[in-house]
């Protein structure tokens, strides 16, 4: 509940209806950026939502935030390499989600120091269809194996582009482009919002496997069960259709 002291300085803009909307979306694992970008453009900034949470104006705690952000001054330690294609080179149709077959990729890791086991995650941008595969570690070789598995499972028509961050596991991009003919575009550093679909989907998967989980011990059955549930949830951004239904529709249009 909201404290009495918080109510004293409650912003006039924060109506009960607005508070209920924000609290509901936060409980659904949305980030403040996603809430503003989807439903509150021009109403307030996402920084305002963070402020309201920290100051106790909303009936949620900071635990509801999926990502707390990096501390100022921290340096990226995941390995550096030269990229060829950046997100600025990506076709506009990918940005607008106009066409089917464009994917965002990421890696979900186990708790630091606990295990090298991790998951390669893939999201089709137009349908939000979500795939995750177990990897032994966060290396370029393991990521290439995961991408190869996705390529062998789906047809090349369903894999037109990949958008990734600058993690060391994606140093396999030249091998991917050479062997599979799939261009790989790199997001800007510290710009997770440029891969918002994947960030959001990873947050949904974390509901099943919290950050302290040793992902090496997650069984294939449990992973599959979680993916089925996620892909069969109706999404507002899809007109309350499910990612699974939208993905099937996209495949049918290509056949």
Predicted regions and their residues:
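Charged alpha-helix within mobile-element recombinases
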Residues: 16-20, 24-28, 177-184, 188-255
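Active-site beta-loop-alpha junctions of metal-dependent nucleic acid enzymes
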Residues: 111, 115, 132-156
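Basic, flexible linker segments flanking DNA-binding modules
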Residues: 1, 44-97
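Acidic/histidine-rich, metal-coordinating catalytic segments
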Residues: 157-170, 190
